[in-house]
């Protein structure tokens, strides 16, 4: 007793391994430790694998105990189960087959389901790297009931209540999300992607909090250097008698010629106010210019036809409020036919667009910016008035040129062209539009002439090709003309004249000569399938299809065409039992020429043959069962394989149904019953069974006989077989 106790104590002092712990847990489950305490079975799930649990179920069933460790009931006796109990059970409702051998390891269906669910939840392999303390606690829980291992039961999540009953105590687990990623790691946000990865979606937190902060940072970074671009487009500002288009580009630069990033104003209110300030002031000045020019035009009628385009002269460079210099360029174009065609109405309208690029610091408030723009606009008005006065003085020189000088053009700045063109210089708007239309018509005529030239060259090349083919004698006239792509059209004008002459009963000899002459290329007199009306004549080579006509083949036609392409001389020789020496005598069979076997070099024939073998093997067992054949299926397959070896497979297999494939195999077997499989002759002569198969395949007896004639062109009687050429 003493040595045994010492040995057990020594075994417990040794470090516990995973294998030894699994074995001791299996033994505890085998002895029924989990029968009285079901939570122990869930504790064993942390150590056992699927195969380990299956071993426990098998050992318990051998010991006539229920295979489910949590069940204390024994297995039913053999007398209760029956000695001749079946092994499998077929469920017609679920269309499944159940193995009852596994069910015999359990006392009831409930234990079978519970055991299968528990076994499916176990991992396929044992856990790796379990600490020895946890192994000792788990083993002590099974062997000592949770008390021998100290707090081993509590460490596993099981404790004992005051009344001795074990209660399950779940361990508190707290999940912490790592905020900062270590080296070589990525955060969850980087791995999944930003929240705005979906196009058009902006999270609410980014819309409220993130947006203004980011914009503020960008404004601080670009506060030193920034620019603005304001595009003002004011159309239909005022009405006038002559069309007029004004385009003004105002640019503001710093003294240093350095590249600075452009900063767009995003305030819509500022844009509207700036647009109104600039457009109202300049359009007002522009109206005064137009009125004064009209007065001068009446006084100086001789200067109407002179050119009013001149080069610009340098003027003073305006200085803004912040000291930056501004380049201003204006262009006035009057009477442009393009703008007249675009505008609606009899009178032209002003199309005004202005662009200001200013390199200045954004003011602290919108009102300060508006004040600076108003002051800047007043300076523009004064300079523009000076430029108009200079232009008036230049209209009276001898050269007759009217030049509108730039009001803000500086020396050394980028040159820009300015021109003033009156609408009546080229006549009225209607005359200008007519000139534009005539120019477009001329370009269209030139394009048509080039197309006609290319067509003539193509026709000449086709005629030369046809003439060479006819002169060489390689082809006839009609073939050469069709190959060259030439279509000879009838003379519709002379055709009507010839018909009238024929109706007036002219000389018969002349009519005969006329018929002979024009009979060389006789145009058909039936409607043709072409889209143009030019070919809508009688007697065509292409007749219109009748009503209800369809190119889709029936199932019988599809099967007949497939057999017609498969059969070769070798097939007929094999069916009639002839040797290879007599195959030449089968050149003409049933009034048609029987070809030799053909095999494609690219391997498609073998692929088609393998697919056909699959279809035949699927249809043959059903056919044997329906016809109650006594011949083994293997022999039928071998004989059919020899027959298929003699056939030609060039085209793809037709898409047939299973009933139709069975009929195809039946045709082959019927042909083989003549010489190769004579035992099938009585079955093939049974009209009732045969008619039943024909009805299922939707084929009549006459159609079936026509398919048999492809394989038996000389008939199936012995006399016709003996009369074959040998």
Curated annotation (Swiss-Prot):
Residues 220-241 have a biased composition (Polar residues). Pfam families: RPAP2_Rtr1 (PF04181). GO terms for biological process: cell differentiation. Its EC number is 3.1.3.16. The keyword Cytoplasm does not apply. It catalyses: O-phospho-L-seryl-[protein] + H2O = L-seryl-[protein] + phosphate; O-phospho-L-threonyl-[protein] + H2O = L-threonyl-[protein] + phosphate. Coiled coil: none annotated. InterPro entries: Rtr1/RPAP2, Rtr1/RPAP2_dom, Rtr1/RPAP2_sf. This is Putative RNA polymerase II subunit B1 CTD phosphatase RPAP2 homolog. The lineage of its organism: Eukaryota, Viridiplantae, Streptophyta, Embryophyta, Tracheophyta.
